[in-house]
């Protein structure tokens, strides 16, 4: 711990400084699967103007009058299906904690670096972890939204929340925000390795490999959000790295919500169409998620698989996210080391 008391007057209070913080931030998670934890989480998530850009006069009556009365039970049941019962938490929290611990171990050669993790929605909050890093002497903090592809509804809202807290601080730490890494060679190599490793465990070869990204409304893209372009580039680079063609590799978008048109093609409609067209074996992966969560474990490994098999498909496999694997941590570590340059 840096104290450098010799640089201070003899009667100066003991202070810590000279540290650099790294804060890994993912989307968030409810604290439990029953009604009230789910309602608190969904209220925070769906009231974010970056997520739902509709007029508050239009959206809030729908949110508080309909959505938050009906959706907590439905979403809670879905979380219950993929809950980490051993730790009594979501796997997103389990993996993000592990990523933070492994990152701290990987950066031991920088004794002045402190690693922590937070969630944009739910706990631990971004504000609480910024305060914790400051208390440990961090005068500089690298803020790492764990999203390879930039979107206003993901990366930007993490940055918003961090700076919202900084507005309340008398003494602000210096902040760097990690840029998108959708085309980083280490990221593409990690994804390609995860595909090869997973397919090597199968006794069959998929006819089609689908990269399913979380969708956003088309209106967001038309307003200038680069997310769609980032997803397309990631998919193209991964396809090239795997030596596949557009005949056996495709990109889709999932998790649409509400009446708007979202980015297409839709994942659920696509797997249904492939099965009806006679495709018997497919593999689906989620390159935009650094950790498995509700959208990958329940929506893809569960629901999408059921749709495909119900409509005539015979073999379905979900390729896990990079999570806290060696390949996954290699990607995150390389990004962090690059972005820390000049600070350590």
UniProtKB/Swiss-Prot annotation:
Residues at which Fe cation binds: 214, 295
First-level EC class: lyase
EC number: 4.98.1.1
GO biological process assignments: heme biosynthetic process
GO cellular component: cytoplasm
Primary localization: cytoplasm
Pathway given in the UniProt record: Porphyrin-containing compound metabolism; protoheme biosynthesis; protoheme from protoporphyrin-IX: step 1/1
Location of this chain's protein in the cell: Cytoplasm
Key words, A-Z: Cytoplasm, Heme biosynthesis, Iron, Lyase, Metal-binding, Porphyrin biosynthesis
InterPro entries linked to this entry: Ferrochelatase, Ferrochelatase_AS, Ferrochelatase_C, Ferrochelatase_N
GO MF annotation list: ferrochelatase activity; metal ion binding
Database matches in Pfam families: Ferrochelatase
Reactions it catalyzes: heme b + 2 H(+) = protoporphyrin IX + Fe(2+)
UniProt superkingdom: Bacteria
UniProt similarity note: Belongs to the ferrochelatase family.
Record HAMAP family: Ferrochelatase
Function: Catalyzes the ferrous insertion into protoporphyrin IX.
The protein, known as: Ferrochelatase
Species the sequence originates in: Agrobacterium fabrum (strain C58 / ATCC 33970) (Agrobacterium tumefaciens (strain C58))
Organism placement in taxonomy: Bacteria, Pseudomonadati, Pseudomonadota, Alphaproteobacteria, Hyphomicrobiales
């Amino acid at each position: 711990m840096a104290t450098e008391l010799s640089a201070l007057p003899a009667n100066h209070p003991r202070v810590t400084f000279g540290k650099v913080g790294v804060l890994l931030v993912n989307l968030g998670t409810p604290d439990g699967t029953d009604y009230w934890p789910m309602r608190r989480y969904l209220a925070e998530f769906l009231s974010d103007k970056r997520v739902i850009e509709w007029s508050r006069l239009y959206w809030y009556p729908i949110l508080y009058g309909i959505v938050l009365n009906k959706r907590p039970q439905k979403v809670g049941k879905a979380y219950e299906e993929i809950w980490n019962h051993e730790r009594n938490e979501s796997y997103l929290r389990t993996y993000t904690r592990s990523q933070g611990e492994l990152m701290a171990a990987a950066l031991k050669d920088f004794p002045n670096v402190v690693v922590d993790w937070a969630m944009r929605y739910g706990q631990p909050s971004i504000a609480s972890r910024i305060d914790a890093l400051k208390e440990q002497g961090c005068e500089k903090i690298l803020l790492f939204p764990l999203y390879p592809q930039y979107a206003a509804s993901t990366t930007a809202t993490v940055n918003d929340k961090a700076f919202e807290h900084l507005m309340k601080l008398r003494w602000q730490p210096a902040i760097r925000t990690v840029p998108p890494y959708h085309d980083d060679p280490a990221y593409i190599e990690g994804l390609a390795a995860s595909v090869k490793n997973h397919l090597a465990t199968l006794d069959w070869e998929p006819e089609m490999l689908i990269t399913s990204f979380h969708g956003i409304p088309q209106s967001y893209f038309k307003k200038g959000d680069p997310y769609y372009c980032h997803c397309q580039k990631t998919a193209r680079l991964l396809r090239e790295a795997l030596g596949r063609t557009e005949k056996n590799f495709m990109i889709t978008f999932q998790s649409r919500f509400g009446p708007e048109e979202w980015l297409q093609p839709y994942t659920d409609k696509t797997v249904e169409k492939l099965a009806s067209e006679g495709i018997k074996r497919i593999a689906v992966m989620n390159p935009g998620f650094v950790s498995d969560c509700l959208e990958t474990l329940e929506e893809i490994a569960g629901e999408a698989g059921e749709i495909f098999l119900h409509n005539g498909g015979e073999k379905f496999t979900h390729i896990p996210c990079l999570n806290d694997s060696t390949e996954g941590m290699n990607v995150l570590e390389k990004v962090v080391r690059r972005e820390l340059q000049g600070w350590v």
